């Protein structure tokens, strides 16, 4: 038979057949990589097997892979007990870090992989699929990507298949780090940025305390570490460089693709809390257009409010937003009244239903308004009581209009709509130390409301002493000022 195959003897063909079948079996049972102690050969720019030593195979790297030499994928997750709005804040910490990290030569192709949303503590509805949700369900990924190089989890898997390594759809994670707090955080009264791998205590890979990310069926972890960590996100660069050095055998694999995981990322502090970098990342967190449309339709139909009538700024791209302080808002007041565990764990600062209603009615009279939109996790019984307390006023509360919409939005989407409606109110009052309230503060700062109409907090009782949330105004910048010279040796 004519062809370009080299002339191989019968023993060589038998050896080739044996190696091919053995490799295939190893990949099928998921042990091909875990049985190899050293992960250095697991992440090449193209898979180059022993076949190239026997057969004259052509180069198989597609152009999109050749252009991603040195890609570093950073997966992260958050403690399973943390809620939706704290997770948004953790994202900002990681996004600001990765945006700056990509200026380094070794990390020029870094990707931040967004973890699937697990079923969170506050998502109580039954009969809804509320685990493993992609970030695209809640956020506009194109908007996020204009700030930082992020990938939804399924997009990450798709890119991994381009590399064909170590046997798609399995993904080799070179190192996974579960971050922990130091037991003693101050040294002679001083807080110092530092980290160290834990060697004096057992470190369980199976624990979900750092988040359920590693339960994803596609992930195979090479080395798992517990790390005591204290400091801001920038310290993670040193941790990642140490891992890259351990995985690099020589010059030939310096630019190999790497994948690492950071668990309990809420341990990491902000590099730039409250400055223009923080606010650029926050402004990029536009909600999914589907959710924004549901909120816009509800505001128009139930509250007779549009972008134009509210006088807010909402350009198509967050980059076009400018400093503004003259937003008017719709003809309604929004109250975020946190109930649930706050009633038990924060009794000293959480008002009763009657006390909250008294405060809201006083505000409505002061602003000559009759409508209050209520965002709350109150029980159905508590909602009935609140309606009675507001019997001379109009109480509005968002609920999905059908079971189809409820299945589409899910509990997290309903909460997003609540926030978007509160963001457009003439006046807002929130709950003390609630991250849900904090995110509404931020949204209203971006839309252009005055601080006096935004940074307001429910008191325990009308006329009593009152703990109030802090005021942190938005910070604007004409352009990015985070450019810096790259002094990396490689």
From Swiss-Prot:
Pathway annotation: Protein modification; protein glycosylation
Assigned keywords, A-Z: Carbohydrate metabolism, Disulfide bond, Endoplasmic reticulum, Fucose metabolism, Glycoprotein, Glycosyltransferase, Golgi apparatus, Signal, Transferase
GO biological process entries: fucose metabolic process; protein O-linked fucosylation
Entry's Gene Ontology molecular function annotations: peptide-O-fucosyltransferase activity
Main location (coarse class): endoplasmic reticulum
Site (Essential for catalytic activity): 443
Gene name for this UniProt entry: O-fut2
Regulation (activators, inhibitors): Does not require divalent metal ions for optimal activity.
EC number: 2.4.1.221
Compartments (UniProt record): Endoplasmic reticulum; Golgi apparatus
Positions of GDP-beta-L-fucose binding: 81-85, 336-338, 418, 435-436
Annotated protein name in UniProt: GDP-fucose protein O-fucosyltransferase 2
Function text: Catalyzes the reaction that attaches fucose through an O-glycosidic linkage to a conserved serine or threonine residue in the consensus sequence C1-X-X-S/T-C2 of thrombospondin type I repeats (TSRs) where C1 and C2 are the first and second cysteines of the repeat, respectively. O-fucosylates members of several protein families including the ADAMTS, the thrombospondin (TSP) and spondin families.
CDD domains: O-FucT-2 (cd11298)
